[in-house]
Structure formats: C-alpha cells, structure tokens
A protein has these predicted regions:
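Intrinsically disordered, low-complexity proline/glycine-rich segments
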Residues: 1-176
C-alpha cells in the first residue's frame, strides 16, 4: 500500500493528514511540537490513537520512541557514522532491527529488515511541495512504517538545522 504524506512545514501545530493511494484520509498526525517534549500522535481516520511518537530528551544522538498501548514498540536513531551513505537504525521491541538507507534530504530511501524491503519512501512519486510517498511492504504494519518515516524525517530535519546553526555566523551574513 502506498500513502501520501503532505506536511504543513509552516503550520503552528505540525498537524497533517496522510492519504492512501485512492486519496482517502487514513491517518492523521497530531503534532504537539510546542510541548516540552516533542510528541506526535498517529491517529486513524476514526480518531483512535494508533501510535505515539516521542522525542527522547536525554540521548547522545537524536532519538525518537514509537509507543502503542503496551509501551515502546520501536526506537529510531541515526546510525553511528557511515562513510558510504547516511543511515538510520530502528530497534523493535523484540530486539530485531531495521535499517534505513538512502538520500534523506531528497526523501528517497528504503527501510529493510535483514535485506528484505519493508518500506520505501520517495518524493519522486509526487510533484507537490513538501509531499512524499510511503510504500509499505505486504504484511507490514502500516502505522508502524509510517511512524518510522515521520521519525526519520523529523530527526533528519533537526540534524540539518543543527548543522546549519553550527556554521560560522549561522551560515548567513552574521552580525557585525
């Protein structure tokens, strides 16, 4: 199944809908970015919370947890330095791992488990600004894969913002 994620980057609340390939609204991301701890709720079309995404406050690397009613089901973080390409790792509650590799700035990457494709994220399927597609592999948990995509997108944006802020004079003309 393929989903359309259209973020409202400049929205005060960071809320946005996720549509299926038929254009039906199937998930709603309720962003609580203004809270002390960045939190998102992924709700289904009826309003029921499927998962909650929380940014960890105290972690060496930017880290987000995905929780359901029973607790943390996945933890998403950047992989340690990889000279070949950017990577993110996802640790599931049962200890298994997923790996995300690709071009995160262009939103064109894959999510694999032991070499098996479980999800693909691509901006190339759509020509709408701030929009990308999430394709979920057969038999995979749609809400979990979408939540992982939201986490990686958010962590990557935070990393890019921090990198920009670390440049001399913030990357701009500076203050004189």
């Amino acid at each position: 199944m393929r989903y359309l994620v259209q973020e409202r980057i400049f929205s005060f609340t960071a809320d946005f809908w996720i549509e299926d390939e038929n254009g039906d609204r199937v998930f709603f991301v309720d962003g609580r970015a203004m809270s002390l701890r960045e939190t998102f709720e992924l709700r289904d079309a009826s309003g029921a919370i499927r998962v909650i995404i929380r940014k960890k406050l105290f972690a060496l690397r930017d880290t987000m947890d995905i929780e359901d009613g029973d607790g943390v089901i996945a933890t998403v973080r950047p992989a340690f330095f990889s000279p070949i390409r950017h990577r993110y790792e996802v640790t599931l509650a049962d200890g298994s791992r997923l790996e995300a590799t690709g071009n995160f700035a262009d939103k064109d990457w894959e999510l694999t488990s032991d070499g098996r494709l479980v999800g693909r994220i691509s901006r190339q399927w759509f020509r709408i600004r701030d929009t990308y597609g999430v394709e979920v592999g057969p038999g995979e948990d749609d809400a979990l894969i979408i939540a992982i995509a939201v986490c990686i997108d958010r962590i990557h944006e935070d990393e890019e913002r921090k990198r920009h802020e670390q440049r001399p004079f913030g990357g701009g003309f500076g203050q004189f």
